[in-house]
Amino acid sequence: MKENIIVVGCGIFGLSTAFKFLQAKKKVTLIDPLPILDSLKSSSGESRNIRFSHANDQFYSRLSWEAAKEWKKIEKITNKKLFYDTGIVWFAAEDNGWESHSEKTIKMLNIPYQHLSPKDAMKLYPSLHIDDLHFVLHEPHGGTLAAKKCLLALFNLCLDLGCDYINGQAEFIKNDIYVNDKRIDFDTAVWAIGPWIKHVFPFIDMIKVTMQDVVFFESPDGWEAEKIPAFNDIKNGFYGCGSLDGMGVKLGYDVKGQEFDITQNERTHSESSVNHCRKYIGHRFPVFKKAKINLIKTCQYTMTPDANWIIAPHPEYPRHWIIGAGSAHGFKHGPALGQYVTDLILNNEDPDPKFALMERQERPGGWRDLYQYE
């Protein structure tokens, strides 16, 4: 029987999984030593993009499409604005690249999209430079999630459904879990602990944690998240979204950053990364050429060598499951990923082999190299 579930970690993976176990009428205890919105967590931050394009990978495309529907349901349950579904675009620099393969996949899955000429894409933004674009892939049902509000909404839903919560440090000792020297009873444990995975389970040495910078630029009217699509540029390595809560347009430089030890290092932004952001935003959106920076934030990515997640039982103690290495893509799959993990555990099923605890081929480009389309 799997009636008594422990979920360690209150980030997006942990809360989504706990929520789905609770919906399945299981007893759930959440454990986390940090506050829900602590900035050390990989799930911290104000916003995340949600999109369905994943090149040829139907699993990820289908999962994110289901997650978007789940987020809309959670909005209705909580009566809170969580999902700005104003679309998301891909600025394609070639005709037969990542974006084209994504288009074929989402078409196959009946996920709505538009293949726009660069000129037509100019209607989506108050200012847009298009001379270096071949086309623009527009996903009208993608957009921006208010990440902090999403975490709080899920956490409060879990409590409303009867979840127990322990604000404490969980210790893995062989097949058991202790908090404050007290053994906790459970049938199944899910460890969703982000960058701490490699510290609690040292045999999982493939995980790398890197520092990544996001820059918020002072924005004129018309650049709010509810008015413009979020955006991605794979060739140049950028992603961003409109202004949320007056913070300014967000731009992230999505090239693998410096490695980072969550237990030792301080988080400091890279001047090079910030300069790349400043140059790009003025290029792509000319109205921002002289824009002031409102804020710079440094977060961490937790990644495997091939950028696929870890979703697997412990090799020696199979009642412990380890999930994580979200590579900053947890929110776009969150509730649907939680359902996937819950179904695996309750139905005694094996996860997709790409999520296994195995050696993986290094892909230096991270998620942009993840989906092979040769």
Model feature map: region roles:
Residues 283-374:
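C-terminal catalytic lobe of FAD-dependent flavoproteins
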Residues 145-223:
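Predominantly flavin-linked oxidoreductase catalytic cores and closely associated redox partners
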Residues 47-124, 237:
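Dinucleotide-binding Rossmann-like beta1-alpha1 core, especially the glycine-rich loop
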Residues 3-30:
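N-terminal Rossmann-like FAD-binding beta1-loop-alpha1 element of flavoenzymes
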Residues 23-43:
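Glycine-rich FAD pyrophosphate-binding loop
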Residues 19-23, 81-83, 193-317:
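Active-site substrate-recognition segment that forms the wall
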